[in-house]
Amino acid sequence: MLNAETYVTSTEGTGGRIRVHNRDFEVEEIPLTEPSGSGPNTWIWIEKEGRTTLDVLLDIARELHLDRRRMGFAGMKDKRAVTRQWICVSNTAPSEVKAIEERIRNVKFLRVTANEKKLRMGQLLGNRFRILIRDTEIDEPLETAKATLQELEDKGVPNYYGWQRFGSPRANTHLVGRALVHGDVKGAVDSYIGNPLEGESEIVSEARRAYDRGDLEEAYELMPSSMRYERMMLRPMLRDLRRGEFSDESYVRAIHALPKPLKRMFVHAYQSYLFNRAVSERAALGINTHIPGDIVIDNDQHIIHDADPDELEELILNFEAHPTAPLYGSKVPLASGRPGEIERRILEDEGVSLEDFNSIKVPKLGSHGMRRAIRFRIWDVDAHESQEGLTVEFSIPRGCYATSVLREIMKKDVV
């Protein structure tokens, strides 16, 4: 995981491989509520394979001839997986939605019903995972996995952001965000459209090289349909170029051409990159203990004030409170003591200040920041073996990453 160095469990790693096939990695959303069956909005319980949530939403919006902003979902789900989740289409009849199912690639509509309310981001309890680990590398992988899961139940799981947060497989959205926070909008656009990486197809690499040469027309012509977001960014740049009006504002327009969830993700990815480093260094001091200077939150995300160290220690051991690290932003409080030293050193190493997160040249992409727990709780764990390999099952809260659990089991970086 990007910028993650620390393990919190004492077991050896099972090794192995995940996601050999999409069906090796299953995710099912744990909803906060079920739709009522009546109302102006249509909720769809979808199963998708090998596709991002955002791509599916865009396809459904296109087939229904709707603005993407009419679509709602509770959380992004993995691309390289089989996932099930609710999505919502506002002010649309279920019959209209059912009519387009066959036109949405690699997606099944398992249930289509109505509801009074729309579905908003974050409106889920968590996610349930069933993951097959193939080709394990030790003699007793099942016993090791069970021991690791038990330790994680006792201590908590490091709350690292997974590779998906950074735009896997390119995993460079944090670099786009870093450029934005540093005030370099051109550098942000260049990082996203250009900069071919090893492992990309030749046509994709050639399109990126054309962009890096400054040949925007050729880059656009070369780009396959899979580069839909790069093409979105290039359109306003090409329009300005053809009119002889190309300027620094053209790069701002390129960012604004993207769907809102994606363009917001850039700064969030950079915050996540820094957060992972803070978690890694803080977890090395003990993930389930209070260190003087910690900012501690309860399960409702409220900072706990005026509690003595012994009380905080007991709350943390009982999973009623959690040490935190910063998602850096213009208004986030920083810890004191040893945790605070870690947090301030990270800013110094990056050459940024908290205020830089609110001084971004692209409007509405700044962030005030927040404190986030350095660990999360895992529940309903299970593990078993078959001829295919080792299967682990567990549930985790919304916004947390299964790869953090797998990393502890396998003792290797996982994507």
From Swiss-Prot:
Q: Which residues form the active site?
A: D78
Top-level taxon in the UniProt lineage = Archaea
Enzyme's top EC category: isomerase
One of its Pfam families is TruD
Q: What is its EC number?
A: 5.4.99.27
Disulfide bond annotation, renumbered to this chain: none
Q: Residue ranges of the TRUD domain? A: 156-376
Give the UniProt keywords, A-Z. Answer: Isomerase, tRNA processing
* Catalysed reactions, semicolon-separated: uridine(13) in tRNA = pseudouridine(13) in tRNA
Name one molecular function that GO assigns to this entry. Answer: tRNA pseudouridine(13) synthase activity
One GO biological process term is:
tRNA pseudouridine synthesis
Q: Answer whether the UniProt record assigns the keyword Isomerase to this protein.
A: yes
Cite the PANTHER family for this sequence.
PSEUDOURIDYLATE SYNTHASE PUS7L (PTHR13326:SF21), TRNA PSEUDOURIDINE SYNTHASE D (PTHR13326)
- UniProt record similarity statement: Belongs to the pseudouridine synthase TruD family.
Q: Main role?
A: Could be responsible for synthesis of pseudouridine from uracil-13 in transfer RNAs.
**Which protein are we looking at?**
Probable tRNA pseudouridine synthase D
Q: Which organism is it from?
A: Methanothermobacter thermautotrophicus (strain ATCC 29096 / DSM 1053 / JCM 10044 / NBRC 100330 / Delta H)
